[in-house]
Amino acid sequence: MTWEGAVAVMIGAAAVILALAAFGWWRRTRRDAALDAPVGEAPEGAVDVAEFRALYVATTVRDQPLERLAMRGLGFRSRADVTVTDAGIALDLTGKPRIFLGTSRIDAVDQATVAIDRVVEKDGLVRISWRLDDGTAVDSYLRPQDTSARSLADSIAGILTPHQTGTDA
């Protein structure tokens, strides 16, 4: 095979791989088209408890950390400002409207090590288990930037009732 032929085969293989990846993402966005992140502000009178800078990693199907959901507002990794209030958690992702998870929506908070393509040191991620408007159970993963994952998890656990804090939070 000539050098030009080898290059043509490599370009063709790369094009097929990119086409398959695009097709897979298109199918995933169609599957998750009905899922929406809860966009909105904290209720009036909510008191800020703590603020954190974090990397938003992903939202997945509950207890399936490798099954990303492609929902509007939470489909892509992003920098995030996390504001913990006495009424819930506000997520401000770069370029997206504010997402507010009220305490009644949050089922648990704990720490994790892996989500999608992110593997970190033991318990380096914060996993927030919550429910969408339609009742779908999901997990969202955050990687704190200026503090420990335990500090963020403890701050969130502090606003939840005891049965909401997860197994190790």
Question: In which residue ranges do the predicted regions lie?
Answer:
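Ordered hydrophobic segments in well-structured contexts
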Residues: Y56, D81, G88-A90, F100-L101, ...
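Cytosolic/nucleoplasmic/matrix-facing N-terminal domains/tails
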Residues: L66, G73-L74, D92, P97-I99, ...
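Acidic, Ser/Thr- and proline-rich intrinsically disordered linker/docking segments
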Residues: R27, V109-A169
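N-terminal signal-anchor transmembrane alpha helix of single-pass membrane proteins
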Residues: M1-E41
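Phosphoinositide-binding peripheral membrane targeting modules
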Residues: A80-I116
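Anionic N-terminal interaction surfaces
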Residues: G24-V82
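Short leucine-rich amphipathic alpha-helices used at interfaces
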Residues: R77, T83-V84, R127, D134
